[in-house]
Amino acid sequence: YRRQRQMCIRDSAKTLRMIGQMHKAISVIQFKLEAEIIRRRPDFEMDDRMLLHRIDFERKTITMPNGKEYELKDSFLPTVNPADPYKLTDEEREIMNKLHRSFVSSEKLKKHIRCLFRYGCMYTVSNSNLLFHASIPLNADGTLKDVSIAGKMYKGKALLEKVGHLIRTAFFAEEDNEDRPFAVDYVWYLWCGKDSPAFDKDKMATFERYFLKEKELHKEVKGHYYS
């Protein structure tokens, strides 16, 4: 029993180490792919979320957008080329191609998503109650905040309806629909963008939480809706 227990402990440590390595590898892929969207959509105003090029691998530090240099908890990122930090390696691209095929070929997943997007909504009114997910972007004085989407301003109900339209365009529109590429990118912004009604924070501090020990950098400042 003692020997079996020791083997289990060793196997658990090995498994945890492998999970950690996989987590780090897929996180780096995430940062690289997010950079592609950020570069493609300057109107998202998310340049501060591109951080890989700020790493000094020799010093094992990173200079953050606030101008300060911080020591990395882990600087071993073998898939990041300092000369071109956001370029996927061949192996990373192969992983993403396989993941993409798995998602688009899953009929059960398509069925669930199709149901959500066909019948779901960014908001609804039930028993005279307004129901919505997360927040409504507000100004400091509590008034509805104007949010820019593709060069036009939206707020309140109009914002939620525009977001709902973009979500459906991303999923239901044909590949050659000229509005689809922006809609697809906006679905990502909806998840982590500062003016997204589904997020409404100044940033998603994924990199900071994984690689920096300073707690103040982990903080995600919520919008005025939460004040």
PLM ranges: what are they?
Residues 1-9:
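Single conserved hydrophobic/aromatic residue that forms the stacking wall/gate
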Residues 8, 101-104, 226:
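Catalytic cores of large soluble enzymes that bind and process phosphate-bearing ligands
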Residues 10-17:
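A conserved mid-domain beta-alpha-beta active-site/ligand-binding segment of alpha/beta enzyme cores
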Residues 28-31, 35-96, 100-211:
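Extended, H/D-rich, highly charged conserved domains that either
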Residues 215-221:
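Short glycine/proline- and acidic residue-enriched helix-loop micro-motifs
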Residues 221-227:
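C-terminal, well-structured subdomains that either form a transmembrane helix-short loop-helix hairpin
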